[in-house]
């Protein structure tokens, strides 16, 4: 079995954000994000070793295979979510929601203010992530929250905006005070990136909307 490996995307590392210091970004990007990349790759090596993760001993209570597959989801989603997070941040923000995105937000959530309030509420309520995404099956925009990278994920949700709510995302700047970090996050959104994600997500929905017959 081939070994799938990931490489960290250094070009996504943001700098000089408003309200989120470079000192905060440094361990977040270099230790946490790159740590998930490294552990995902290590897990792939072990899964490729048929002797290490003996499939014949797979067990729902405990087995090496089960543990590797569980941690594979945690580390892989840790990589993807962090890349989506870092990739949409730019100093002081940029642009605004496109007319198409604003119309969709109005239809599905009740407007940009309502969407912002929902995202902020999810960011306070969930321990890992708050997400605005497009449900690939219904075509609706949905605000979702995760307690960990791999806990409460909605199958088929394409993330457009992701807020990291783990304490490692804000502890250097704000200690245990999450609200000012959330406010700072919204000041640095690159709407050009979000708009592009939305356009691609809608194309994916159009291609897959009859996926479930």
UniProtKB/Swiss-Prot annotation:
The EC designation for this entry is: 1.15.1.1
Q: Which cofactor does it need?
A: Fe cation
UniProt key word Oxidoreductase: yes
EC class of the enzyme, as a word: oxidoreductase
Q: How is the cofactor bound?
A: Binds 1 Fe cation per subunit.
Quaternary structure note: Homotetramer.
What protein am I looking at? Superoxide dismutase [Fe]
Q: Name the source organism.
A: Aquifex pyrophilus
- Name of the gene: sodB
